[in-house]
Curated annotation (Swiss-Prot):
Gene name of the encoded protein: pfa3
Span of domain DHHC: 97-147
PROSITE patterns, per the entry: DHHC
One Pfam family linked to the record: DHHC
Name of this protein: Palmitoyltransferase pfa3
Primary role: Palmitoyltransferase specific for VAC8. Palmitoylates VAC8 at one or more of its N-terminal cysteine residues, which is required for its proper membrane localization.
Length: 329
């Protein structure tokens, strides 16, 4: 009975692990399977591309593991002090945003992740392939994963194409049909993966050089800004260095050298006129931007209209008034 109980317990543990880390197991299995096929091609057609593919595979697995195991960071894990830290994303009264679920204050660019059940520093998105949030502390590893996976797919595509064409053009070639089936599968997989990862890498490169997260790029609250007035856009080089680090020699290496601790970010000087103000400054801004005939409280036809006008701000980019709350996402 003891043996049966132990075996049953072990099986249950294995099933729990498989269920919990299903996507990670699938991802690593695909990487290893593709590399096994690619190495088989290298053994038959030896060239330098095969060595490059092996190096890229090592970098892919390394970055994948680091993205999974590195916590993205949370405001509670930093020296963030809502009373002394300069912030852009504040409430109308100038106070820091407060997360009701975490029961803690949120710093700039932090958002609550329902999957991780905590607030994430500079949250980009929650990725099912990593079972982790992509945030300030692991964003570099995530980007390098995309970058190296893109190069890997292109190199595998080239290597497979060369192997197939050599097989069909060489005289007296004697290659087993099973090899051609595997190579055909590998070629099709590499085509699809290279297309997807090229688009994905270009997209995330664009986000980095414009200092945007995926959440911010998809938010209607940020669509009102141009690149020149985006609050955190301080130039493509400085934007890039915030995540990838100051040293160009470490940009493509999986070392955690992002600048700062993800709490405070330099602001774009061009965006200063459009940044949220305190209640007092908002009131001054409002009075200077609405016609004098309706600026006084006695001019309001109803409490609702008074609230509506006092809680709107002129957006010069959109050419219309917008709710102040929309600026505070």
């Amino acid at each position: 009975m003891n043996l049966i109980h132990k075996v049953s317990t072990i099986c249950q543990c294995v099933l729990v692990i498989l269920a919990k880390y299903c996507m990670q197991i699938i991802a690593l299995s695909l990487m290893s399977g593709v590399q096994w096929l690619a190495w088989g091609i290298y053994k038959i057609n030896k060239n330098r591309v095969g060595i490059i593919i092996l190096f890229l595979y090592i970098m892919i697995v390394t970055c994948y593991v680091l993205t999974n195991l590195t916590p993205p960071g949370s405001p509670s894990e930093t020296s963030f002090d809502p009373n002394s830290t300069r912030q852009y994303m504040t409430l109308q009264n100038g106070k820091s945003r407060f997360c009701e679920k975490c029961q803690e204050y949120k710093c700039d660019r932090s958002h609550h992740c329902s999957q991780c059940n905590k607030c994430i520093l500079r949250m980009d998105h929650h990725c099912m392939w990593f079972k982790n949030c992509v945030g300030f502390r692991n964003h570099k590893f995530f980007f390098l994963e995309c970058f190296y996976l893109n190069l890997y797919s292109i190199c595998v595509l080239y290597s497979t194409f060369v192997a197939i064409t050599k097989t069909f053009t060489a005289e007296g070639a004697n290659i087993s049909a099973i090899y051609l089936v595997f190579w055909g599968f590998l070629f099709a997989f590499a085509v699809g993966m290279s297309i997807v990862m090229t688009a994905f890498t270009f997209y995330h490169t664009s986000l980095l050089i414009h200092n945007l997260s995926t959440l911010e790029s998809m938010s209607s609250s940020w669509s009102r800004y141009t690149h020149s007035t985006q609050p955190f856009n301080v130039g493509w080089y400085e934007n890039w260095c915030q995540i990838m680090g100051k040293s160009p020699f470490l940009w493509l290496l999986p070392f955690p050298n992002s600048i700062g601790e993800g709490v405070e970010y330099p602001l774009n000087a061009n965006a200063l006129p459009y940044l949220p103000q305190t209640e007092e400054k908002n009131d001054k801004l409002y009075k200077s931007s609405v016609p004098a005939s309706i600026a006084g409280a006695e001019g309001w036809s109803s409490d609702e209209e008074q609230y509506a006008m006092k809680n709107r701000r002129w957006n010069p980019h959109m050419g219309q008034y917008e709710w102040i709350e929309d600026f505070l996402v």
